[in-house]
Amino acid sequence: MLKFRLVCFVFIACVAGFAQREPVLKQIDLPHPYYFREMYLPQLTSGPSSAAWSQDSYSLVYSMAGSLWRQELRSAKAEQLTAGPGYDYQPDWSSDQRWVAFARYDHDAIELWSLDLRDGQTRKMTSGGAVNVEPRFSPDGKRLAFVSTSYKGHFHIFVGRFDNGLLSDVRQLTPENVSSLPRYYYSQVDHEISPAWTRDGSEILFVSNRGHIHGTGGFWRIKAEPGAEAHEIHYEETNWKARPDFSPDGKRMVYASYLGQSWHQLWVMPAEGGDAFPISYGSFDNVNPRWSPDGSKIAFISNRNGNTSLWVQTIPGGEQTEVVARERKYLKPMGRMSLRVVDDLTPQHPVAARVFVAGTDGLAYAPDDAWMYADDSFDRSQRPFEAHYFDTSGVSEITVPAGNVEVDVMRGFENHFEQRKIEVKADSIAQLTVRMAPLSVEVDSTSNWVSGDVHVHMNYAGTYRNTPSHLIEQAAAENLTIVEDLVVNKEQRIPDIAYFSPQLDPASTADHLLLHGQEFHTSYWGHLGLLNLTKSFLLPGYAAYPNTAAASLYPANANVADMAHQQGALVGYVHPFDSFPDPAQEYPLITSELPADVALGKVDYIEVLGFSDHKSTAEVWYKLLNCGFRLPTAAGTDFMGNYASLRGPVGLNRVYAEVPREPLKIEPWLAAIKAGRTFATNGPLLYFLLGGQGIGGEVRLEKKQQVHFSAKLFSIVPVDHLQIVCNGKVARELTMNSERTGAHIDGTIPLGASGWCVLRAFSDKAEYPILDLYPYSTTSPVYVSVSGAPVRSAADGAYFVAWIDRLISAARSNTSWNTEAEKQSVLSMLQEAREKYAKMK
C-alpha cells in the first residue's frame, strides 16, 4: 500500500529495450513460447521433475534442483550424480544399467549428454546449439530417440546410434509438414514430441498435432526408420504433457491426461489404441509417468502439495508412496546459508520478499521446499542464464556450494533493491540478515494509493499446484495489496473454475485481498478482463475457436461487455498490442475490437502496462483519448501463478489506485480504477498534479494559459525519461536527479486546447531487477477543458475509421457465424462505432 499524494506521472518506453532482453531458448521458432517453454521444456524446480527406472525396478534416477540423483526406493538417501555445468534434466537409464542419457541446459541451448555410472564421467552427445530433449533408449540400448529443434527450429523426432556414450548416424525420423489448419496457439508446422519405444524396439510412439487445430495432438506410431509412414492410434486433446510410456509386456501404455477434468492424471489404454481410463484421481497434476521394468509400479511426478514431488504407484493396487530425499549426498563441498529479511523500520519482524541466490558455480539455488521461478527472457551480455528466484516469508535456509554466494532481495517497488555477497564454508551455516530500506516517498495524510494486479491466473496448466493462500503469499513477497485472479480456459479445461465466486476469497487478509474474476478468451476480438462479476461465470468463456461449437465470431466483445456490466463488473482490454497497428497494411491482420468498444462506452480500463509492448499500447491509447474518450489505465502482469518459467512475478505490472484512508476494501479500489484515479507501473512511482487537479480530475480553463504542475518520481531503478505528455505530444521533458531515480519538479506548461495530460517515465533498455521489456510508468489522464470545447482529432478519427473498416470487411467475409442474425448484429455494432469516429472530421 502506497500512501502519498498523486500528481500525474507518465512513463514512456523505448524500443531499444527489446535489443537487450531476449527470450530464453530463442532458437525455437514457434508461437506463444510462454506455453511450450513452461509445459514442455524442462524447468528448474527444487523438487523432482522426471525419473527413470533401474532394470531391477528397485531404484530411480531423477532430476531435482537442476542435477541428476539416484535413490533406492527403500532408502531416504539420494546420491547426486551430476553437478553442472548447467542444469540437468530428463534422465533415461539404459537397459545394461551403465548409461544415463539426459538433457543439459547450458550455453543458451539444451544438448544431450551421457553419464557413465561406472566412473561418473559425462560425454556430450549433441552439439550445434539447438534444443534437444526427451532422450529415450531403445530396449537394446543401441539407439536413442529424442526431440530436437535442429531442423528449422521446430520440434521433430530424431534417432541415432548409441555406442560408448556417444551418438552417431543421427537421422530425422519425422519429416516437416506445414498445415493449412487455422491454429491460434500452435505453429502451422506440425510437431512431434514425447517418443517412446515399443518393447521390441521396432516402432516409436509419439504425440503430434498432425491434422488437429487445438492442443498438442494425439498418439501416433511409426516404424523406427526414416521415411516410414506414421499412423494415429488415438486422439484426445493434449497439452504438451501426455508423455506416454509402454508397459513392459508391451500391451498397454500409461500417459497423463486431463480428459473431462481440469487436472492431469494417469491414464492407461491398449498399446494399439482403444478406450482409455484413469488409474489415478485428484484435483492436482500427476505427470511424467514411467512404468517399472517388472511391471508392478509406475513412477510419476505430482504437484499435489504445491511443489513437485516424486511418487510410485503400484499397478494393480493403487497404493501411492512418495520418494523423498531426506538425506542428500553431494558431489562437492556444500554449506548452508540462513537468510533473514526484515523491514528497516521494524527489524525485529521478518518480512516476505523475492530472493535471487547464485552460488560460486553461477547456478541458482533455493530452499529444498521453495517454488523456483525463472525469468522468460534475459540479457546475454549480463548473465549466462535467465534470473531464477524464489519467495521467502522472511526466514529461509538454502544449501549452496561452499564459496562466495550472491544474494539479491526485492520487495515490490516501495523498498530499495538490496544486493549482498556472503562466504559460505563447507559443512557450516552462514547467517545473513538483509534489511529492506523504504524509498523516500513523500507521504501525505490525505492520500492513500493501493496497489493491485488486475491480470493474474492462479493456476494455468503449469508446473506447480497453486492455492488462494499461496497466491496471497506470492503477493506478500511482492508487497502487492490486491490480486485479481482471472479464471480462464486453457484449451478445453478451466483449471480454477472451482474457485470462481462473486465473494472475496476467504484467504484474503487485512493487508491483501484476493478476488476471482474472468478473462474472456476470444481468439479473435482481443482478450477482456472482467472484474467483479457478481452473479455468474460467462460460458462459454471464449469465442472464435475454429472446429468447435464456439467457432462463430459471436459473441463479440461488445456483447460480452454488456453481459459483464449487467453483473456490475468492470471490463478492460488486456495485453493489447505487441506492435503498433497499422490499418493501411494488409498484414498483420487487425481483429481487435478495442476502438469500437471504446466508442460505444463498453470499456472501463485498458492495460497500458501488460503482457504486451507498453509503448505501442500507449500510442493507441493516446489516439483514443484524442478522440474524446475517457479511458483510464490499469495494469496486469498476466501472471501465471503456477508456472516455473514465467514473465515476471505477480505485480510485475501493477496499478495504484487512490482510495479513502479506511480499512482495505475492494469496492473503493474498483471505483477508483473506473474513475481514473490510477497510475500503472512496473517500477517507477509517480506523482502528478495539474492545475490543482490530481489524476483522473479535470482542469477547466476559459482560455489558453500557463498551468501549474507538480511532478515527482521515485524509482528503485534508473529511468531515462520523465515527461509530461499532452494530447499525444511531449509537452515537457523533466530533469531527474543524477542517479535518474528521483525527481521533484514544480513548473508550468501552456494549455490552449481541450484534451488531456499524463505523466510518464521510461527507460531505453531493460534494468535488472525489473523483469520486463523496460521500466515504464504512466498515470491516467488529467483531463483539460478549454472554453468547454469538445476533444476531437480528425486524424485519429480517420485512423480508427480505417481500423473498423478492416473489422467490418473481415466480419462480412467470415463464414463461421451460426446465424445471419448474429452476423448482422455485430456488423451493426461496428457500423455504429465507425460513425462516431467519422464525426471527428
Regions of interest found by a model, annotated:
Residues 449-633, 637, 643-644:
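Catalytic cores of extracellular degradative/oxidative enzymes
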Residues 344-363, 369-372, 380-389, 395, ...:
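C-terminal functional module detector
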Residues 56-58, 96-98, 140-142, 200-202, ...:
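Short coil/turn segments that connect the beta-strands within blades of beta-propeller domains
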Residues 321-336, 345:
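Beta-strand-rich domain onsets/edges
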Residues 20-40:
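Blade/loop signatures of beta-propeller domains
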Residues 35-69:
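Beta-strand-rich domains and repeat architectures in extracellular enzymes and scaffolds
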Residues 23-24, 44-45, 63-69, 83-88, ...:
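A flexible loop/linker signature enriched in serine peptidases of the S9 family
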